[in-house]
């Protein structure tokens, strides 16, 4: 059997024609465990929906989050969904995200939707204003929070959060929806470090592959804006 010994991701890539990934270095988040971190989270009542954006070149991505406190007053992080665009500019992609949000959460008050990103999305370039600046104008009127989100401290914060045990309320502190396949693949190793080479010091820096890193950067932006403050100033 030609498939013997292959991982599910490799089978998906070779047989099903899906993107998939072939591990080419240690995962950025080795503490991610499918049985503990994948489930069916929903958006709790009276909780803002966080859309975290990464405007990757020709591959923009957005992830949908909820950050909420349980009856034990502990912070929880639910990763509800994600979208990406292939060979599409930021503005048409954003219009699709806005339309999808209305379909997926039809009763959600628009005032309960918050948008976050990295400061790079606001930079003016030779082609004009950054997408964050454009989307702040009519007809979109998105109110972005954005700041410089360095990779290493963000990755470290997420790693530490993934290591937390099940909460005293009985629920996982972090849960990603099982339908968000590319995000799960990213956590499992699609988003990875460079492979170590004998005799050479390899900097612990996530690989930029133009696919998984865009999804995972958006997740890091969401955490920087809405998780870090909860950890610094708990309850």
Segments from the language model and where they lie:
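Mg2+-dependent endonuclease catalytic cores in nucleic-acid-processing enzymes, primarily RNase H-like
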Residues: 72-207, 227-235
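Charged phosphate-binding loop/patch that engages nucleotide di/tri-phosphates or the phosphate backbone
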Residues: 12, 223-224, 228-230
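ATPase catalytic-site recognition across NTP-hydrolyzing enzymes
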Residues: 1-53, 58
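Stable alpha-helical structural segments in soluble proteins, enriched in small hydrophobic residues
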Residues: 214-226
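Generic detector of well-ordered alpha-helical packing
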Residues: 55, 119, 214-215
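C-terminal helical/tail subdomains of lipid-metabolizing enzymes
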Residues: 210-211
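Short acidic-glycine loop/turn motifs at beta-strand connectors
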Residues: 66-72
């Amino acid at each position: 059997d030609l498939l013997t010994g292959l991982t599910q991701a490799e089978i998906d890539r070779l047989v099903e024609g899906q993107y998939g990934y072939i591990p080419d270095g240690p995962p950025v988040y080795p503490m991610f465990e499918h049985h503990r971190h994948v489930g069916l989270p929903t958006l709790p009542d009276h909780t803002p929906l966080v859309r975290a954006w990464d405007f990757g070149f020709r591959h923009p991505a957005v992830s949908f989050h909820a950050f909420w406190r349980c009856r034990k007053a502990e912070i929880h992080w639910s990763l509800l969904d994600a979208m990406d665009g292939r060979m599409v500019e930021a503005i048409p992609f954003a219009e699709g995200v806005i339309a999808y949000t209305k379909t997926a959460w039809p009763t959600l008050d628009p005032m309960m939707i918050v948008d976050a990103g990295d400061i790079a999305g606001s930079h003016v370039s030779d082609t004009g204003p950054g997408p964050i600046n454009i989307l702040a104008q009519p007809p979109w009127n998105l109110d972005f929070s954005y700041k410089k989100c360095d990779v290493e401290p963000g990755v470290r914060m997420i790693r530490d959060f993934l290591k937390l045990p099940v909460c005293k309320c009985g629920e996982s502190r972090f849960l990603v929806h099982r339908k968000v396949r590319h995000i799960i693949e990213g956590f499992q190793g699609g988003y990875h470090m460079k492979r170590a080479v004998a005799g050479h010091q390899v900097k612990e820096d996530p690989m930029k592959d133009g696919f998984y890193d865009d999804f995972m950067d958006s997740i890091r932006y969401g955490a920087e804006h809405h998780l870090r403050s909860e950890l610094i100033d708990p309850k």
